[in-house]
């Protein structure tokens, strides 16, 4: 189907988002065309602002407007425990349960040799640097229960154990192959309470 160039560009742009195929992208593009111009401008500004106004915390790697992030700045947090997660959505999921009071470290991915992603390609070197702090006594590995998550957890466990820091893994109950961000608060709460040492 031939579309005017602006519509084609918009469809192509929407298709870059995860889970958006050609039909959904087309539907979104035509919906955008029907929106009021000021709503479209606000939408476009929100997209640009997300890229311009957010950064990654220099301590934990979580998205933030201020560096360090509000979690790392919170003096009430238990600084002896760091929960390692794959991405920012996992921090948000963990924070929703309101039970975990430690700090986080966001890897921004997982080890995936099939995709050419090794330990140096994600935020593992910064984690190792953080662990030189004597305050850290436990590392909770909260990777997704899939092959890449398990590989990443095993790699970090082997890397950290010689340092003498306790390494634990979330209890099962999270479905294998699932994503942490989709787990409900009760499941996450039980997984953190029942974590096991690696």
Swiss-Prot record:
GO terms for molecular function: DNA binding; zinc ion binding. PROSITE patterns: RECR, TOPRIM. It comes from Staphylococcus epidermidis (strain ATCC 35984 / DSM 28319 / BCRC 17069 / CCUG 31568 / BM 3577 / RP62A). This is Recombination protein RecR. Belongs to the RecR family. Residues 80-175 form the Toprim domain. InterPro entries: DNA_Rcmb_RecR, Hlx-hairpin-Hlx_DNA-bd_motif, Rcmb_RecR, Rcmb_RecR_Znf, TOPRIM_dom, TOPRIM_RecR. Keywords: DNA damage, DNA recombination, DNA repair, Metal-binding, Zinc, Zinc-finger. The gene is recR.
């Amino acid at each position: 189907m031939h579309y005017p160039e602006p519509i084609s560009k918009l469809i192509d742009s929407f298709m870059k988002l995860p889970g958006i195929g050609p039909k959904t992208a087309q539907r979104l593009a035509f919906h955008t065309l029907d929106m009021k111009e000021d709503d479209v401008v606000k939408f476009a500004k929100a997209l640009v602002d997300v890229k311009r106004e957010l950064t990654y915390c220099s301590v934990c790697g979580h998205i933030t407007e201020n560096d360090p992030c509000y979690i790392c700045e919170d003096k009430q947090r238990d600084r002896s425990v760091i929960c390692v997660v794959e991405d920012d959505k996992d921090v948000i999921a963990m924070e929703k349960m309101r039970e975990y009071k430690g700090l986080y470290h966001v890897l921004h991915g997982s080890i995936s040799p099939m995709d050419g992603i090794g330990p140096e390609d994600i935020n593992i070197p910064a984690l190792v640097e953080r662990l030189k702090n004597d305050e850290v006594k436990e590392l909770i590995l909260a990777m997704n229960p899939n092959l890449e998550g398990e590989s990443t957890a095993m790699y970090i466990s082997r890397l950290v154990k010689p340092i003498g820091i306790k390494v634990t893994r979330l209890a099962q109950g999270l479905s294998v192959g699932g994503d942490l961000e989709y787990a409900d608060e009760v499941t996450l709460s039980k997984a953190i309470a029942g974590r096991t040492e690696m």
